[in-house]
Amino acid sequence: MCIFCKIINGEIPAKVVYEDEHVLAFLDINPRNKGHTLVVPKKHYERFDEMPDDELCNFIKGVKKTVEVLKKLGFDGYNIVNNNGRVAGQEVNHVHFHIIPRYEGDGEVVKFGEVKNVDLDEVLKEIKG
């Protein structure tokens, strides 16, 4: 059983900020910023694209409700981050979104790396092929 399933089942304690029948949202134990929260679906799915549409809708609604709760922290903006697969940085194989509140002057910057030289026409051809 994964660590998030253990948290959902109450086997591991967590600082819960929001919960409904579909999602659990709790403070990240290694926060990037004040209020950094993880939102997880209560049903176990490893990747975002594996979730059935109805579960996905409920999950996204839970993410939005979590943001509403976190607004009490008075942040100036926020990042929502989701990694799918090991090479993308996913460390726990249970779908989860990071909500990272942002505060003016906090020094946290989410940037993409070096721009890759990619032929967009070739990529589109491969996708549609």
Swiss-Prot record:
GO molecular function: hydrolase activity
A Gene Ontology cellular-component term: cytoplasm
SUPFAM superfamilies attached to this UniProt entry: HIT-like (SSF54197)
Top-level taxon in the UniProt lineage: Archaea
Motif (Histidine triad motif): 94-98
Pfam families reported in the protein's UniProt record: HIT (PF01230)
Matches recorded under InterPro entries: HINT, Histidine_triad_CS, Histidine_triad_HIT, HIT-like, HIT-like_sf
Domain HIT: residue ranges: 3-109
Protein name as annotated: Uncharacterized HIT-like protein MJ0866
